[in-house]
């Protein structure tokens, strides 16, 4: 340890004879002392001389002076060091060895060198004799004699040239010895000026007259330690003025020594109980025998009078090295306080300990360890302790009661019982042999003269006022009780001027050793405040400068010489460092029980020991007063095992190969060894303890059985006291519960024995207590006719964790006030949570259920069937699943599957449910409350909320009841009835209220929410379409009205139930443990996680070592995970030695890593050191042999077949159900391949077996064998779906084997896996993985849901990444995330974790995303087989093999082709919604941030496929995309031969492919279906009577080709002028640059209609003027409206357009252009005669005029006229003000107010008519639509004079010899049109040809196309008008 400048140190004594180079057992001790140094004042310059000497030049006496170390610091004003070198044996050049740290070691002996030299040095002193410095060497042999040798100054010759002189400042470090070729440095001999004489005095009158002398131990101990051995403890007592040889007592006692650094300056700490104990334990107790009549003093002796002689041994040494961490004590600084009474001390600032890491070399002789040496160290310095010393002169007041003073409880003269006293540290002495500041001394009780009386911590007896030792009887090692006698009146201790006698302190002796009352407190006694017996705690840790084994022995001290003190003066204390021991805290009782010590706050006593020293010239006096609370034991606490936070105890026995749990005993078993205890904790894992004994006793007049489990080092806290072993009691059998049940197993047993009894719950029960076989249908068999009540004394109780229905059948029974929590039930037949069936007037009231039910047939949240039975004030909350395909009839309901009978009812109840079903027949029903309600059964005052997703279109499905019809009688009078019910359920393929509508339904006051999505996916006209269902909607309420309506219907709220008795959180209470600090409560809780099985005292001890600036002090620790580099370690036994990292995971999911180093095993726990923190860590598992378990279970596990009946029974499914959708078969095989390795991990992470015990291991073997199928299923499931990583950490092992990662320390991984495997087929379906985590894993992990768990893993292991970044780095799917080109949108899309985020992970984990189950399949993709495209409104998924064919083969360019195409597709989708974002208002823009699912078809090609793949793959396809992604997601897409279809929330590509260009156009079509009502149409919805296809094809979707001659808007494809077909383009070149806002859109359409209207006008003029009647008949047709009754809603106000050929009379009327409008004329060129049905796929032709302005006079227009007028309104008024009002229900409320209404599914709705729209849009400007149309034409006619010149390709010239033609005015254009019209008229019936193509067969069409294209190009996509005076 470093010696700081100016520090005075004189050391001349030795501690234990076991310390040395050679063990005392071989009769020799080798000691090497550091030469004492002279006093050096601060900053004084000193001369230092290095003289280099060869060892051959030394005499034998000089060799004995050799110090095997490197000189460290300047100490005196003139120093000479002889640096000794040894000639290398082969004369090779070598580096000087690093003999140790100059900062830490004071003595070093190299084993091999000493063995050769045989040097023996015990102590060195310097004394001036006739102005000559003489070194005195005391050589000590094992027999106790010494030899004194004087050594004079050395001379050197061989290495004279290397001599060097230095001028250095006091306290500076000395230079290192030089490297000398051919020589090796071995040590030094120091020559100095000071003497080693010293004295100790408490108070002095003058330099010549001593008053009282205090005997202090000043000793030096080398840095070696022996193993525990029996040695001779030599102790010496020297009387005053006597040279009498020391008395020696031989004590035989096994012990291990502790190493005290001889050069440290130790200081006493009273920072806290913990700091004090650590500080004081730097030395262990010693034993000393003193003659009762011989007085002890301190005197200056002549060394020749102390000669000891002996013979030395020189054994051969071998060594090895180990690493040890120790604590460093802190220094103490004394400050004068003039306001504090003289002689009084007070702690101003508490000290803090440092730490040291040492590499220790262990020497052995004949394979037995004899000593240890410290090779290297690293040190963290401690912080000092500051003590105030009073200087105020005060008058001592004796016998004054109730005085508020510094020192309380003990006063001078008080009788104090002795107690165990820790040893004093070594003293630092001056150059005159006088002690400096005394470290580690407790304050002593002083007399009224300020002199010490009782000195509790001194190794020798207290001396009398004459300076002579009191006579003290010899004291043996303390083993008994000590009770404290507290003084009544505390007094303040002061010091007066002048010499005074010290009052003698009478001391009451201990019971074992009588002591004269006049004697002072002696070694082995202390002031003790504990009431209980105590014994020293084991010291199991190492201290700085020492190595201690567990049973620390005592160290004897040799007294030092002293000489009379001189005048006293004050001197500041010098800096120094000291070492703190690791252990501190509690003491232990006789049986090893840890006893908490009093805390600081409970002690009012200060004891002061004062030590005065002065130097030889009398100029400086050092006075030390250290403070210690004598009520506190400061020994290290004994480290033991303790099972804390025990929540439950289970006793098991093995009999005839069967294990049985006992909740009571009949008698004392004869074979307790066949029993074991499972100790369950609320915080830690289960621990198995072997039973040692079972005995009978009585308590409270009851016969009880005491079960005792014994384990090494295990103690149990009972009533705040610790006792060995672990005990608890069981009742005598016969006291079974009869009415009030607190055990589920007892309840089940009792009811099964008496099915008609009355039963009350007395607590919440856990169904896990009862294990069911796979054949059991329920817990209680038979028919229950009694009563079960779940409430007692106003408390509501629940049954948790049902895995099957509670009852099989109920008949006339009553069940009330009962809650069923966390049910997870699956079955092959009809199932319900409470019972399968209730009959005969069963009453169910206030029964509340939450959980999940899955079955193959009927399912009810409470009951599968209620026949003539009632349910009232009850509820269900959870999920119900039946997705099996079967032809059997079944009924599914949120509360009841089938409610039947006149007396059957549901009243004042509710269901909050998510139902997944696959009904495909009319006798399969699904309802939010009940599936089938028949035979006069009724539901009233009830409601349902949630979602019903029925895959197929058929079946009876609805939000309240699936069907009310009585199928048995077929009589409407006996149908079920609904009264005052509400549906707040989203329904797919069903209705809102009932699933089947018929005349005469018995329904009244039914309500539904407008906000609900209620729709059916149907096939219409060979197209799959999604249609909203208005059938059976009842009264539709706004979302804002729903909550109040529910409250009006009923106010049912499930009660708050009592938690499980074992689920209550029980935290350890550390507050009563010694050294507890309230501000460290969190730290103790954290350390408890690091040391889960250690006793509280040990936890407090290490908790007090945690620095306040550390994270461990500031944050709550959730878990600690061992790692080997970056890999998580689970198999602790196999990796015990190789673990090198510890990850600490905190509650905020931050983490930090520490280096981890294995130290040793303690009580079958592997113990590790954590970095340089001084803390320990033990894994949450005991070490035991697992091979026997693995070897016995492995064969049976390997025999399990995945497709076996046993596996199906475990899954709970019928033989015909395929296992395909589990997607586990391949993984099941892989799991079995490495079972042995997995079982090691599993057993290492499961329950703790504290010892190898066949009964306990057999229990585990039996459990695994009985559940082998479930275990393998659970393991396979987690290995399949959690095999992904965070950086280098694979999460699979964390999920499987570290369920405590999030702080749930009491989870059993084995039980979790078994429970998962037994959770049922539905729960293990791959598609249910999100729910499976929530149901089967979250509660075991201490988490809530899958996605927060994944995020928290990421925060721990990849804190610098986002969730999405991690996800993309982990998945093998090819992900394209395309942000908008609009800056404000792009910014929002970068907001991680928001609804705006473009990140795939953020979107698929959104609560609104239907397929959140995609995450795990994407994370575990084994290969790149799937692509994902994310844009603002959609999220697309497809397979690479969808594009695989001969052209793009898997081993060719398939991957690059797909990935390039994916990027192009993403850009198109981005551009499309950038277009929409620009033209919508803010409300509409916000709604674009959504997730519409896009799916490519399940059509996968091969390398031999021609063109597009057409074969549809099913879920058992081996294709990797299907097997690893689409199948596990479970979206059963219905395939057809069409291009694509939409369902409202998804788009499915069929014939078209997502990544093709036609797929882009399809995208605009299908996304219109998903967007029109709520977004494009401003939220007003589609106009009544207009079908979904009206809005897509021909209106809002993009044109199929850029050459399409249709009135449409290209919103998605970018074209280029360099395209080969640019000359044919008629659509916008680039929508991203053309449309910047809605104004741009209107301008484009308006300017386009300038051309359209002009050309139509010219063509119309030509027809009416140039053609005869018959030619007009051929060129034109007429359009009319037809009103048919709508088959869905029964209304006849929706127009259907019919195109007819003209009659001759009609043709004759066409004499002017206006007559074309007035007679509803349109061109025959591209509009064939026929009916244009509503909701059709029609487009408005760009060059075939519709002159008509036909409106829907009764209501809604037809599909042709509606599209044409919509575009004309867009041109005239814009999108928001023109098109949207026309095609939406924007004016519905206006219509309603005007009395224009229709009835939609029984509800009155406003009917928006064309007349109303015209009036509203144009504010009454036009009276008719014909007037509007005429005005539009006239607007262009008025501009004809301003027509711009245009040059176009002459269509009359044949290709490729096209010429150009230029027109300058309309007249020229009219002439060309006349010619073209006449040319077409000359062709015979060309419009009627089947193969007619206007592009090639019509001159008019070709002319109009050429003109349009020319103006399109000339105006740059109609950015400008074709008229001069318009923009």
From Swiss-Prot:
This is Immunoglobulin A1 protease. Belongs to the peptidase M26 family. Residues 235-305, 371-394, 426-640 are annotated as: Disordered. Zinc metalloproteinase which cleaves human immunoglobulin A1 (IgA1) in the hinge region, rendering it less efficient in coating the surface of colonizing or invading pneumococci. May be responsible for pneumococcal infection and is potentially involved in distinct stages of pneumococcal disease. The keyword Transport does not apply. The keyword Iron-sulfur does not apply. Its cofactor is Zn(2+). One of its GO terms (molecular function) is metalloendopeptidase activity. The lineage of its organism: Bacteria, Bacillati, Bacillota, Bacilli, Lactobacillales. It is a multi-pass membrane protein; Peptidoglycan-anchor. Residues 419-469 are annotated as: 3 X 17 AA approximate tandem repeats. GO terms for cellular component: extracellular region; membrane. Its EC number is 3.4.24.13. Residues 609-619 have a biased composition (Low complexity).
